[in-house]
């Protein structure tokens, strides 16, 4: 298994629609308009967060149950920024829509800009032949409110290509998150 370079990522996005919309260079903004970087990097792709957020609140239930999750536990926010309460979390989605090749596994890592502020990004691997918007989970590990910026970089995707194709892909299994659009809540 090997990690894929900027050239491979660019080719797969342009010729096979692996990432849409696709930014073929790393965008950092300018001195008077700084942004958290996004787009192609040397061995990955920095994704942006869309302006749709679901901020967790515990006013409706005392227990979080992934098999019976209460959608009322979230407050929907559409904004260029999202404020996450202390020791809480928010869900969002990527601006980008992904189509993962059959011989590729994609791993997501948080960006250091957020990690150094106590904001952790969690995303499970994007499996072979999965497609959709990526649902992002932001944990605010601090005792203060934390800010997330929409349409700026929030995490980096690393593409690992196997020496052989998998026998059964996510699409073949009929995965429950296949083709998801928007922020997607837990499914069982």
Curated annotation (Swiss-Prot):
The gene is dcd. NCBIfam families: dCTP_deam. Belongs to the dCTP deaminase family. This is dCTP deaminase. InterPro entries: dCTP_deaminase (IPR011962), dUTPase-like_sf (IPR036157), dUTPase_trimeric (IPR033704). The active site is at 137 (proton donor/acceptor). It comes from Pseudomonas putida (strain ATCC 47054 / DSM 6125 / CFBP 8728 / NCIMB 11950 / KT2440). It is an enzyme of class 3 (hydrolase). It catalyses: dCTP + H2O + H(+) = dUTP + NH4(+).
């Amino acid at each position: 298994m090997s990690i894929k370079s900027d050239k491979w990522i660019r080719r797969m996005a342009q010729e096979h629609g692996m990432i849409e919309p696709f930014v073929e260079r790393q965008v950092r903004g300018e001195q008077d308009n700084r942004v958290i970087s996004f787009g192609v990097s040397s061995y990955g792709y920095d994704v942006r967060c869309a302006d749709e957020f679901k901020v967790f609140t515990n006013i409706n239930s005392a227990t979080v149950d992934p098999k019976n999750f209460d959608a009322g536990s979230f407050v929907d926010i559409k904004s260029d920024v999202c404020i996450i309460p202390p020791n809480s979390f928010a869900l969002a989605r990527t601006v980008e829509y992904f189509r993962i090749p059959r011989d590729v596994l994609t791993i997501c890592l948080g960006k250091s800009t957020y990690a150094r502020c106590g904001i952790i990004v969690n995303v499970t691997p994007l499996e072979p032949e999965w497609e959709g918007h990526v649902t992002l989970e932001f944990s605010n590990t601090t005792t203060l409110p934390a800010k997330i910026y929409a349409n700026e970089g929030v995490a980096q995707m690393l593409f690992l290509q196997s020496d052989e194709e998998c026998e059964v892909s996510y699409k073949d299994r009929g995965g429950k998150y296949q083709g998801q659009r928007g922020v997607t809540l837990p499914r069982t």
